[in-house]
A protein has these predicted regions:
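Helix-loop-strand module that forms the ligand-binding subsite of alpha/beta enzymes
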Residues: 1-67
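Glycine-rich phosphate/pyrophosphate-binding loop and the adjoining helix
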Residues: 69-124
């Protein structure tokens, strides 16, 4: 469940410079389960690679006590990276960016662990 996870990687497309409505709805619906956890974004879209969508949702994350990390993987013109078999094939640069994102997310997750422990003690 969301409550049991320590960090999240949100993957979102960009619709008119905003994230997917389903992402915003999930964030709002599970309000109490997000607190004191790190979050990262992999976004995709046209020329911006979905970066506007990721930036637009970050204020909501902070209101929910999620910590969005600065690293992000933005995949521009993503349809060019889908093979005939339907498999997504990232560029080498995108794969390296994803590795860096996950490493940084792990650091933030560890740094926020004391806050999660304190919050669970306060609730229990």
């Amino acid at each position: 469940t969301v409550a049991r996870a320590d960090a999240f990687v949100f993957v979102t497309p960009e619709y008119n410079a905003f994230p997917a409505p389903s992402l915003v709805n999930a964030l709002d619906h599970l309000y109490h389960e997000w607190g004191h956890k790190a979050a990262a974004f992999v976004s995709y879209g046209g020329s911006s690679g979905g970066m506007r969508a990721a930036q637009a949702v970050k204020p909501l994350l902070t209101a929910l006590q999620l910590m969005p990390i600065p690293q992000q993987v933005a995949i521009a013109s993503f349809t060019r990276l889908i093979g005939e078999d339907g498999t997504f094939r990232p560029t080498d640069a995108q794969a390296r960016a994803a590795d860096r994102l996950l490493a940084e997310l792990a650091r933030w997750t560890a740094a926020l662990a004391p806050l999660r422990r304190a919050a669970s003690t306060d609730e229990g």
